[in-house]
Every structure is written in C-alpha cells, then in structure tokens.
Amino acid sequence: MIENEYELSNGRKIYVFREVYDYAHQLSLLKWSMTRPFNFSPSNEGMLVGQKTDTILSCQTGLSEDQFKEMMRIDQLDPVKKLLSNKKLNRNWINANVSKAPTFFHSDAFVEGSLSLLYYLNCEWNLSWDGYTVWANDNLSSIEHIEYPEPGKLVVFDSLIPHKPTSDSPISPSFRFTMNSVWS
C-alpha cells in the first residue's frame, strides 16, 4: 500500500493510499455497490424539476460500523485504522456520477476532527474519462488538491475541507462509483 500525505494551506490534511486491495476484492466491492438501490440525490431536486437527465445517483449502504470495517478491511490497513481510531462511523453511502452531473463544493461534516473516507470503486478508469475529485481552500477561491479516480485508491481527509467530484467525460463507459463515509 502506497501512502502520500498532503497538507493544505489551512493545515488540514489529505491522506492518499494506492494499491489498497487486490483486484478480486476491488471487483467484489464494485459488484456489491452496483446492486444497491440507488436514488436521485436529494441535493439534485432542483435539477429534477428542470428535467435534467444527467444527475448524481446516491444510496445509503445500510452498513453498521463493524460491517463497513469488515467489508473495507480497515483492520488490515494499519495507517487507515490508525487515522480512524477513536472515531465512530456517522454515515456511509455510495455515489454514482455520470457525465454532465451537477457538482458543487461541499463539506461532508461540520464537526471539528471528523474524517471522510473516499474509495474509488471502479476497477478500470482511463485518464481521459475525467471525474477527478477536487479540494478547495476554505473560501473557495483556489484549488488546493486534485485526485484522479484511480482504481483501488482510498483517500482519507478532514471532513471540513470543501471538495467536489468533477463531471465524468461523455466518453466514459460507466458511472464513476465511490464508497464514502464520515467518521467523528
């Protein structure tokens, strides 16, 4: 597992882990995610009224903290386990982004010390398909960090950092799936 740590101008951190799982586990996570009952994200209600056809699909996983840790093998990922120690799972969900989906900067939580875990579920993703995750400074005046949705990448970051996915390219053949969770 390859780890990189990035400190933003406000002192908040982003931890990036690559090659977290073998291909078989990546595929099992993706297949499980694809069987969840997706709904239109409530944040897109205004888009639905305007009959926009491309939107973000989202679903709560319904996993307990123990189930989530087991599925994501948190206990086998020592650096991630250490970051999440003394924290409780608040919520977890899956997003399926498509091209032309509306994306907005947001924070996952508003409690100091909360951490977000973002896992890119796709087993294949071409650089030309876009779908990057972008983190901004607190007043949204500049971009501080960008991550390519590399298959098998796991990112842990301060939940207060404003971030958003960028839209996927129209040439991407599938949704860009992410497993998300917030810990406090």
Indicate residue ranges for each PLM-predicted region.
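Catalytic core of non-heme Fe(II) oxygenases with the double-stranded beta-helix
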Residues: 84-184
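Non-heme Fe(II)/2-oxoglutarate
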Residues: 1-85
